[in-house]
């Protein structure tokens, strides 16, 4: 690593080691914005679930973004993820499009357990959501991470 980057990496790693007092049962954020779906402008529900965050940031001390500030070292329990989901459902209800972010990778099973992801995909399908955009690093994109029981098409 070039010497000029060492102080930045050290700063980022030190910042990540400082505990933050985040409510584990509340998402980072939720809002509604316009999006295009099949050539039509629709309302999209956007949510950022609080998780342990990006494994690359944890593993290598990545300094590309500051999203680690919204994460929880050690992760969030399945029960707390479900509590967060209860709080974001009203933002998604009645929408055709959903965007799910985690400040990491939604389909990294060590960040978001597959069982939880499967539950919420089914819930979004039941709500009538037609399209879901998720955040992920490319190394997690494979068929086993998309083997949901019931998901929007």
Which residue stretches match the model-derived regions?
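Core AdoMet radical
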Residues: 66-84, 88-114, 123-142, 153
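Canonical Radical SAM [4Fe-4S] cluster-binding loop centered on the CxxxCxxC motif
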Residues: 18, 22-29, 37-80
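A broadly conserved sequence feature marking short terminus-proximal activation segments
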Residues: 1-35
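Short boundary motifs at domain starts and secondary-structure transition points
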Residues: 34-39, 89-90
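Catalytic cores of alpha/beta
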Residues: 147
């Amino acid at each position: 690593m070039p010497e000029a980057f060492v102080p930045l990496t050290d700063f980022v790693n030190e910042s990540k080691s400082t505990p933050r007092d985040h409510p584990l049962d509340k998402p980072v954020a939720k809002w509604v914005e316009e999006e295009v779906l099949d050539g039509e402008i629709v309302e999209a529900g956007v949510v950022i679930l609080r998780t342990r965050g990006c494994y690359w940031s944890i593993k290598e001390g990545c300094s590309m973004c500051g999203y680690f500030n919204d994460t929880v070292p050690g992760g969030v329990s399945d029960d707390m993820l479900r509590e967060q989901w209860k709080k974001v459902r009203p933002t998604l209800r009645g929408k055709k499009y959903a965007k799910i972010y985690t400040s990491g990778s939604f389909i990294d099973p060590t960040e978001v357990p597959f069982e939880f992801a499967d539950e919420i995909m089914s819930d979004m399908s039941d709500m009538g959501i037609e399209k879901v955009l998720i955040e992920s690093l490319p190394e997690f994109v494979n068929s086993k991470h998309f083997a949901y029981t019931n998901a929007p098409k």
